């Protein structure tokens, strides 16, 4: 690929000829892959348009996007293989669940649910002498593999970011802090409707990882603890506009026929513009684990904090339970944007309390977390069947990747007996690893 070829392509792309000449004259001898170069050019074009031609940094963008000292073949590029399963999972919310007024939550109508419940009940009865049934944290409680989702929890976390590239890219270009926070609120809601599970995902093994590309968002997850189950993550977009990072832990309590889950941790979204946000998730309640109607409910409250401007988006998921909103659907929520001086937060994110005397109200909103969010008469988010970004496997992944788990591979091939044995092998390996760690931990 020579200089004239690149120059012609970039002129066709829309760059003024004098700009192309100035910025490419020093790269005449370079040969790089066209696809990558034009991606860099796209970033440079945005800066050129933004500053009316006064600042065009394609040379700088080249240095930012290419690892210096490495050849073209050494650059990590994503595979073109698309992950197709996301489309069937996105259909769950409106094919497997019924939304009815006066119900505690969404009602699962999956025809296979009774069989799954039967297997789970039988397994729990066989373990009745254990302490699991008495309210102990059961996130690592093992069922037969046929009772599980065909994804690990790490893959579920990635799936919940299905709308992130579109929403966060929009936030980057907004100028008004309040409009940014409104759009960040839609980011949280978009994760909630994707968090609805038909059945329990597979527990990640300690040290298990997952790498995936969601549109232009590169995501890396690792299971760093199992008690409580904790996942660290780092995600960034290819334009370096923003990054998502931190950790999330899950605490669950099993009742006789229900499950309560709290998702908490340090979840940050940071933009190159300096804006930084922190998210606090609501709680989850699942009824009908073993008998009766299976229901899924989001409870308590959630927060999106603008740490840069001291603004808060407060979302109340108990709104449908008040007398005023008795006729609302079970997924109804209300919220408000406020300017704040101080905030009191439950360490595990179950209940978020705001000191009212230190707040200034800015806006109110409401919606249904399965389908819509509105500020006044304006709709800021609406669920669509084609909302999700495409997901791709990465070419270079660690051997600890979820997609390489033997039990998961066999399970997806419907080799249930072999998959069940492989799952038990994974659990035994992890159990032995824990014993070994504890032994040497005590030694020091």
List each model region and its residues.
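Short, flexible coil/linker elements and helix-boundary hinge sites characteristic
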Residues: 1, 14-15, 27, 69, ...
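Canonical RRM/RBD RNA-binding surface and closely related RRM-like beta-sheet modules
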Residues: 1-61
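Short, solvent-exposed polar/charged micro-motifs at secondary-structure junctions
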Residues: 31-35, 74-77, 230
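Low-complexity RS/RG/RGG-rich segments used by eukaryotic RNA-binding proteins and nuclear co-regulators
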Residues: 55-76
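Conserved beta-strand elements of beta-rich interaction domains across eukaryotes
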Residues: 1, 27-29, 40-43, 69-72, ...
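Generic structural motif
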Residues: 22, 64-66, 219
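N-terminal cationic leader/targeting segments used for protein routing and processing
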Residues: 3, 8-10, 71-74, 78-82
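Extended acidic, Ser/Thr- and Pro-enriched interaction/regulatory segments
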Residues: 77-444
């Amino acid at each position: 690929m020579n200089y004239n070829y690149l120059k012609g392509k970039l002129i066709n792309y829309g760059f003024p000829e004098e700009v192309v000449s100035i910025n490419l004259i020093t790269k005449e001898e370079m040969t790089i892959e066209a696809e990558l170069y034009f991606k860099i050019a796209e970033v440079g074009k945005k800066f050129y348009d933004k500053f009316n031609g006064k600042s065009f940094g394609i040379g700088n963008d080249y240095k930012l996007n290419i690892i210096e000292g490495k050849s073209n073949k050494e650059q990590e590029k994503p595979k073109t293989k698309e992950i197709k399963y996301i489309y069937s999972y996105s259909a769950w919310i409106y094919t497997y669940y019924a939304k009815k007024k006066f119900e505690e939550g969404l009602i699962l109508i999956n025809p296979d649910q009774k069989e799954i419940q039967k297997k789970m009940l039988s397994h729990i009865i066989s373990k009745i002498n254990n302490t699991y049934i008495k309210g102990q944290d059961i996130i690592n409680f093992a069922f037969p593999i046929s009772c599980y989702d065909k994804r690990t929890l790490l893959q579920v976390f990635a799936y919940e970011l299905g709308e992130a590239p579109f929403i966060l890219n929009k936030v980057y270009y907004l100028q008004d802090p309040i409009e940014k926070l409104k759009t960040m609120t839609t980011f949280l809601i978009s994760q909630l409707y994707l968090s609805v599970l038909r059945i329990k995902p597979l527990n990640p093994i300690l040290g298990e990882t997952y790498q995936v590309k969601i549109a232009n968002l590169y995501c890396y997850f690792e299971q760093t603890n199992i008690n409580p189950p904790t996942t660290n993550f780092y995600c960034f977009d290819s334009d370096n506009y923003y990054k998502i990072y931190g950790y999330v832990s899950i605490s669950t309590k099993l009742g006789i026929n229900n499950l309560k889950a709290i998702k908490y941790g340090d979840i940050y979204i940071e933009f190159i513009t300096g804006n930084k946000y922190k998210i606090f998730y609501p709680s989850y309640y699942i009824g009908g684990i073993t008998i009766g109607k299976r229901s899924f409910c989001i409870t308590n409250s959630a927060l999106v904090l603008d740490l840069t401007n001291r603004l808060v988006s407060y979302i109340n998921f108990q709104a449908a339970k008040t007398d005023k909103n008795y006729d609302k659907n079970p997924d109804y929520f209300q919220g408000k944007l406020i300017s704040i001086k101080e905030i009191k937060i439950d360490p595990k994110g179950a209940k978020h309390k705001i000191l009212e005397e230190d707040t200034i109200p800015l806006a109110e909103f409401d919606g249904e977390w399965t389908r819509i969010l509105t500020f006044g008469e304006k709709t800021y988010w609406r669920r669509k069947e084609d909302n999700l970004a495409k997901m791709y496997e990465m070419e270079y992944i660690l051997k600890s990747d979820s997609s390489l788990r033997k039990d998961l591979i066999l399970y997806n091939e419907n080799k249930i007996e072999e998959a069940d044995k492989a799952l038990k092998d994974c659990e035994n390996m992890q159990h032995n690893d824990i014993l070994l760690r504890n032994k040497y931990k005590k030694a020091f």
